[in-house]
Amino acid sequence: MVISVATPRRSIRDAVLGGVLGAGGRQLYQPLRCAFYDGAAGGGLTAALSEDGAEGGVPLPCGRKTAAAKNVLILMSDTGGGHRASAEALRDAFRLEFGDAYQVFVRDLGKEYGGWPLNDMERSYKFMIRHVRLWKVAFHGTSPRWVHGMYLAALAYFYANEVVAGIMRYNPDIIISVHPLMQHIPLWVLKWQSLHPKVPFVTVITDLNTCHPTWFHHGVTRCYCPSAEVAKRALLRGLEPSQIRVYGLPIRPSFCRAVLDKDELRKELDMDPDLPAVLLMGGGEGMGPVEETATALSDELYDRRRRRPVGQIVVICGRNQVLRSTLQSSRWNVPVKIRGFEKQMEKWMGACDCIITKAGPGTIAEALIRGLPIILNDFIPGQEVGNVPYVVDNGAGVFSKDPREAARQVARWFTTHTNELRRYSLNALKLAQPEAVFDIVKDIHKLQQQPATVTRIPYSLTSSFSYSI
């Protein structure tokens, strides 16, 4: 006689830790071996919340929906400005494409619901990128699967209940991650709660070429890659071709569909209407050799023989108030505009003829859409290294860490090498993908309309939920 015995359900913390660490982390990224179907009744959100709520104090969901609206939860972290920018671009695209059909919430799950180090990632990241050797060690040191797998499993053990609370607060119909550390723990939680694939989970990668391995998780419904190079990395990391889409980097809709006239923009921004303009940036934090490059540009863009400028400069200092104050107190040979943190970059880019910037993916993608030839003057080790060949090899710009040489290149483009400037501009436009953000939200909309289907789950996860008697 066969007797069925109901085994008590372990807590989410024990299940995650046991499943991931039970084999010393060896099965963390094994090939997907089993299928999971979520179409049957039973379990699901209510049951999961009632069980874990009694144990871990997880509140009932309070995300309210209108009669027809679907909730979209976008997970991000302010480790650099690109993740939030992509999240807000997706939010705006949902609103433009589908109106009130979706309610979109952009949340930093680690900061709002996690403890240390999740709630301290922004400060830690800013510290490390100011000490680039430290960041380089952190980036490459956590690349092996067993290293970041153990690290994320430990975080899941301590903060799983908090993550459950954060996710269920918004009662999401779709979850989007735009950060490499926002896949693993939420996916573990969803699978434990029997909500995946009923709740589609998609990743939107915000690095153009060089990606940290934590971007790639086998359990996602879809992985949106900004370039063919990233798609190749996704395949090498074990994702199936059916999970991968290559649409480009999501950029604010104001960049994608606004038709801006350069002459009108220069009039609006109080710029010289006749002089070519170079845009100098250092990212949201005003990093890199911005001051040195601005000084060199002031010298190189002044024709001493004719005693007149051959170009003008726009400097975006971001949140770096010290840099802005220093530049405002300097004397210049040519017209200069010095700005702080800008929310209307599409206007400043539309008014300029080329750009000098560090190799941030968002700035590169925006410059390509505007057809701006790019001079890359710096990069963050790790995720931005591959952005340099992405620009240079595609003929959209050049790389020079020397501020004086970068300034000379601009002077040549504005005087004797104008044909070269036009060629780089055309190549930039060819590389641009202005509709990427709309293509992504349209594809997510199609996913949401599909019924729950069979999805494959890593063996390590399913094995942790199985008990032999």
From Swiss-Prot:
UniProt protein name: Probable monogalactosyldiacylglycerol synthase 2, chloroplastic
Annotated catalysed reactions: a 1,2-diacyl-sn-glycerol + UDP-alpha-D-galactose = a 1,2-diacyl-3-O-(beta-D-galactosyl)-sn-glycerol + UDP + H(+)
Provide the alphabetized UniProt keywords. Chloroplast, Glycosyltransferase, Membrane, Plastid, Transferase, Transit peptide
Top enzyme class: transferase
Chain coiled-coil ranges: none
User: Do you know which PANTHER family this protein is assigned to?
Assistant: MONOGALACTOSYLDIACYLGLYCEROL SYNTHASE (PTHR43025), MONOGALACTOSYLDIACYLGLYCEROL SYNTHASE 2, CHLOROPLASTIC-RELATED (PTHR43025:SF8)
The GO terms this record gives for MF are: 1,2-diacylglycerol 3-beta-galactosyltransferase activity
Q: What's this protein's family per the entry?
A: Belongs to the glycosyltransferase 28 family.
UniProt-listed Gene3D superfamilies: Glycogen Phosphorylase B
Q: Which InterPro entries match?
A: Diacylglyc_glucosyltr_N, Glyco_trans_28_C, Glycosyltransf_28_UgtP
Question: Per its UniProt record, what CDD domains does this chain match?
Answer: GT28_Beta-DGS-like
Q: Where in the cell is it found?
A: Plastid, Chloroplast membrane
Q: Which EC number applies?
A: 2.4.1.46
Gene Ontology BP, a term:
glycolipid biosynthetic process
Q: What does this protein do?
A: Involved in the synthesis of the major structural component of photosynthetic membranes.
In the database record, which residues form the transit peptide?
A: 1-42
Record's GO cellular component terms = chloroplast membrane
Q: Is Glycosyltransferase included in the keywords of this UniProt record?
A: yes
Source organism (scientific name): Oryza sativa subsp. indica (Rice)
Q: Does the keyword Transcription apply?
A: no
Task: Print the organism lineage.
Answer: Eukaryota, Viridiplantae, Streptophyta, Embryophyta, Tracheophyta
Q: Where does it primarily localize? A: plastid
Gene transcribed to yield this protein: MGD2
